[in-house]
From Swiss-Prot:
This is Protein MIS12 homolog. Keywords: Cell cycle, Cell division, Centromere, Chromosome, Chromosome partition, Coiled coil, Kinetochore, Mitosis. Belongs to the mis12 family. Component of the MIS12 complex composed of MIS12, DSN1, NSL1 and PMF1. Also interacts with KNL1, CBX3, CBX5, NDC80 and ZWINT. Disulfide bonds: none annotated. One of its GO terms (cellular component) is MIS12/MIND type complex. It is found in: Chromosome, Centromere, Kinetochore. The lineage of its organism: Eukaryota, Metazoa, Chordata, Craniata, Vertebrata. It holds the Pfam family Mis12. One of its GO terms (biological process) is attachment of mitotic spindle microtubules to kinetochore. Part of the MIS12 complex which is required for normal chromosome alignment and segregation and for kinetochore formation during mitosis. Essential for proper kinetochore microtubule attachments. It comes from Homo sapiens. Residues 108-205 form a coiled coil.
């Protein structure tokens, strides 16, 4: 059997060519043994039909084994030649052929190409960092918008409650109610200012 590892062929076929040839050899050898056993059985049956035959089954077995050794020797010689033919011409990948997964090695990169590729990688990394920062900023802004939206919702709820209170007290227009509230607030503020002034005047006198 060949001692060449043929690793590239094994990568392509999924098995080593030597393993393939070994299985073929074992299959042929098993078939040869089966044929010789069948021939031996036929000879023994023929001898049973011959009266006063001096040939014993032991002699037949010895002759069968000798013939088997003779056939096996010739078979080994023929198979050795067949193996060389298969491994050199059939199960071998030519040196100028590349497998699909090795096509990238057909045109190797130069130092300039490598530097260009390295620069592209750095640019992509910077772009990724920028996009990541932008994403984080957008998420932060989204959180702020959620807070503002919640506060706006609270304000609208408050105005709705004021509107309901005004309606319960006979004020159907919320704007009128708000204007009235502001006016009353100013009146109260004026009264408070007058009270404070009068209080100061009394203290001075």
């Amino acid at each position: 059997m060949s001692v060449d590892p043929m690793t590239y062929e094994a990568q392509f076929f999924g098995f080593t060519p030597q393993t393939c040839m070994l299985r073929i050899y074992i299959a042929f050898q098993d078939y040869l043994f089966e044929v010789m056993q069948a021939v031996e059985q036929v000879i023994l049956k023929k001898l049973d039909g011959i009266p006063d035959c001096d040939i014993s089954p032991v002699q037949i077995r010895k002759c069968t084994e000798k013939f088997l050794c003779f056939m096996k020797g010739h078979f080994d010689n023929l198979f050795s030649k067949m193996e060389q033919l298969f491994l050199q011409l059939i199960l071998r990948i030519p040196s100028n052929i590349l497998l699909p997964e090795d096509k990238c090695k057909e045109t190797p990169y130069s130092e300039e190409d490598f530097q260009h590729l390295q620069k592209e990688i750095e640019q992509l990394q910077e772009k990724y960092k920028t996009e990541l920062c932008t994403k984080q900023a957008l998420l932060a802004e989204l959180e702020e918008q959620k807070i503002v939206q919640a506060k706006l919702k609270q304000t609208l709820t408050f105005f709705d409650e004021l509107h309901n209170v005004g309606r319960d007290h006979g004020t159907s227009d919320f704007r009128e109610s708000l204007v009235s509230l502001v006016q009353n607030s100013r009146k109260l503020q004026n009264i408070r200012d007058n009270v404070e002034k009068e209080s100061k005047r009394l203290k001075i006198s």
